[in-house]
Each structure stands twice: as C-alpha cells, then as structure tokens.
C-alpha cells in the first residue's frame, strides 16, 4: 500500500542537513547514510550518497529520474548467485 498523500514524503531530518552542508561546501564527496527508507528529494540531484546495504556503503549518484523513489531501491541487500546446477547433468 502506498503512503498517504496528506502525510507527504518521508525523509529523515538529518539527511536534509547533510545534503545542505555538502552543497555549500562545493566538494563532491560521498555522504554516508543509513536511512534506506528516506525518499529522494529534488534537492539531492547531483549529490553522491553512500547507502548502507548491511555490509558496505554503495555509492549512489542521484539523478532526476530517481526523485520520489527510496534510497534503498538503489542499494541491493542480497546477492543472487543463481540456482545450483544438477551435478548429474554436469558429468555427462
């Protein structure tokens, strides 16, 4: 179920402060965040965020197409190795 329109998009408060500091400093450094649940806002376009996936920080460069999505969508938490092949089929 989608979030109620009257509530507005969810974003952790500290995230806006971090983004503003990064914009004012002018340096293009990775902003480390743990908030995968926060919505990407238009103010974040052009910034690089390091989104934590439980193991490491995945660098995510925010573009205009990402606005409205969640940070967690761009940092997968699970690695898929494929299904194990049948050992009998390999022998033949």
Curated annotation (Swiss-Prot):
Record keywords, A-Z: Ribonucleoprotein, Ribosomal protein, RNA-binding, rRNA-binding
GO terms for cellular component: cytoplasm; small ribosomal subunit
Gene Ontology terms, MF aspect: rRNA binding; structural constituent of ribosome
Gene Ontology BP term (one): translation
Transmembrane annotation, as ranges: none
InterPro entries: Ribosomal_uS19, Ribosomal_uS19_bac-type, Ribosomal_uS19_CS, Ribosomal_uS19_SF
Keyword Flavoprotein: no
rRNA-binding found in the keyword field: yes
Function according to Swiss-Prot or TrEMBL: Protein S19 forms a complex with S13 that binds strongly to the 16S ribosomal RNA.
Family indicated by similarity: Belongs to the universal ribosomal protein uS19 family.
The protein's name: Small ribosomal subunit protein uS19
Protein source organism: Rhodospirillum rubrum (strain ATCC 11170 / ATH 1.1.1 / DSM 467 / LMG 4362 / NCIMB 8255 / S1)
Gene that produces this protein: rpsS
